[in-house]
C-alpha cells in the first residue's frame, strides 16, 4: 500500500526488481502488471544459469499475492505459463481453527468412524462458529468486534477491489446486490429474483456475480449430470465461502437469533459446503472437478 513503492513498480519495474533481493513477496501485484514480463525474464535467466552450472531447479523466487483473481489469473497465466503455481487462499477451516491436521473431506467409512470420537457440539455452539466466520483476524485478535470487522471488510472490499470495476454511482446498488445474494445463499441461482428491488438488469447482475465468484466471496456449485449439455442448462447453487459474512450481510448479528430464524437451514448448509470446498482447495485439488449437487 506504499504509494511510492507502487509508483516505482509501475513506472520502472526493472529497477523495482533490482532494488529488492529474492525471494521477494509482492502484495497486490495486479496494480503493477508490467512486473510480470520482467519476472519472466529473471526466472528464465535463473533457470538457464542453474542449468549451465548443473544446479537443481530454482523455485520460490517470487511470491505474488492479489485479491483480484479476475485480473491476476489471466495476466499470470499468459505471462508466466509453465513458471508458476497458483494457490487459492480462503478463510480458515474448522480443522485449522481447532489446530487439527488438514484432511480431505470424502465419504469414506473409516474417516466417518474416526469422526465419532470427536467432540459433539451443541446447536448454539455450531451457530456461534457459523456467525463468527472464518477470517483469520477474527481468531488472531480475540478482542475484535465481529460486526465492526465485517463492516470494515465490506467497505474496504468495495472501495479497493470493486470501485475499479463498476461505476461509482452503482456502489450502493452493489451493496444491495451482495446482500440479496447473501439472503439466498444455499439456493439455486435465480438472477431475476436477485435483481428484484435493486433496479439493475440481468446482464449487470451476472457481471457482478462474476466479480463475487472471482474474488472468492461466493462459489457456484454446479448440478450433477452425466450429460454435459444438461449440466449447462440447469442452475447452479450459490454459496458464500464465509458463512459469517453472509450472516452479517443478511442482517444476523448474534447466534441465538440466527439459530431461531428461517435462515438457519440455508446458512448451516452454506457452512458445511464451504468447509468441503475448502478441504479440496487446501489439498491442491480443483473443487469444480469433484463437487456437484444432486437433485
Regions found by a protein language model. Give the residues of each.
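Conserved P-loop NTPase "ATPase switch" module shared by AAA+ and STAND
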Residues: 18-38
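Conserved catalytic/switch belt of AAA+ P-loop NTPases
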Residues: 36-68, 77-79
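Short glycine-rich substrate-engagement loop in P-loop NTPases that contacts/grips substrate
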Residues: 1-23
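Catalytic P-loop NTPase motifs of RecA-like helicase/translocase cores
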Residues: 3-6, 31-33, 71-72
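Short mixed-charge
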Residues: 48-57, 110-115, 290
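Interdomain motor-coupling "hinge/lid" segment immediately C-terminal to the ATP-binding subdomain
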Residues: 59, 69, 73-183, 187-188
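Hydrophobic "anchor" residues on beta-strands that sit immediately upstream
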Residues: 23-24, 63, 292
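Accessory nucleic acid-recognition modules appended to NTPase machines
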Residues: 139-295
Amino acid at each position: 500500500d506504499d504509494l511510492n513503492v507502487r509508483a516505482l513498480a509501475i513506472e520502472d519495474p526493472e529497477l523495482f526488481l533490482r532494488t529488492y533481493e529474492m525471494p521477494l513477496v509482492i502484495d497486490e501485484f495486479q496494480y503493477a502488471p508490467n512486473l510480470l514480463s520482467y519476472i519472466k525474464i529473471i526466472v528464465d535467466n535463473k533457470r538457464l544459469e542453474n542449468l549451465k552450472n548443473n544446479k537443481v531447479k530454482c523455485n520460490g523466487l517470487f511470491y505474488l499475492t492479489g485479491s483480484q483473481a479476475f485480473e491476476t489469473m489471466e495476466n499470470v497465466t499468459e505471462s508466466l505459463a509453465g513458471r508458476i503455481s497458483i494457490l487459492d487462499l480462503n478463510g480458515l477451516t474448522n480443522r485449522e481453527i481447532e489446530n487439527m491436521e488438514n484432511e480431505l473431506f470424502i465419504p469414506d467409512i473409516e474417516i466417518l468412524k474416526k469422526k465419532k470420537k470427536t467432540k459433539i457440539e451443541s446447536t448454539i455452539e455450531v451457530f456461534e462458529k457459523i456467525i463468527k466466520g472464518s477470517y483469520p483476524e477474527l481468531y488472531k485478535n480475540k478482542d475484535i468486534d465481529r460486526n465492526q470487522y465485517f463492516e470494515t471488510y465490506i467497505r474496504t472490499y468495495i472501495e479497493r477491489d470493486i470501485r475499479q470495476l463498476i461505476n461509482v454511482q452503482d456502489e450502493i446498488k452493489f451493496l444491495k446486490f451482495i446482500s440479496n445474494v447473501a439472503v439466498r445463499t444455499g439456493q439455486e441461482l435465480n438472477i431475476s429474483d436477485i435483481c428484484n428491488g435493486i433496479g439493475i438488469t440481468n446482464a449487470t447482475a451476472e457481471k457482478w456475480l462474476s466479480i463475487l465468484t472471482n474474488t472468492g466471496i461466493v462459489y457456484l456449485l454446479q448440478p450433477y449430470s452425466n450429460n454435459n449439455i444438461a449440466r449447462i442448462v440447469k442452475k447452479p447453487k450459490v454459496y458464500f465461502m464465509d458463512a459469517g459474512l453472509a450472516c452479517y450481510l443478511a442482517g444476523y448479528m448474534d447466534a441465538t437469533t440466527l439459530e431461531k430464524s428461517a435462515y438457519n437451514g440455508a446458512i448451516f448448509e452454506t457452512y458445511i459446503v464451504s468447509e468441503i470446498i475448502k478441504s479440496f482447495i487446501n489439498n491442491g485439488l480443483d473443487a469444480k472437478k469433484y463437487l456437484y449437487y444432486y437433485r
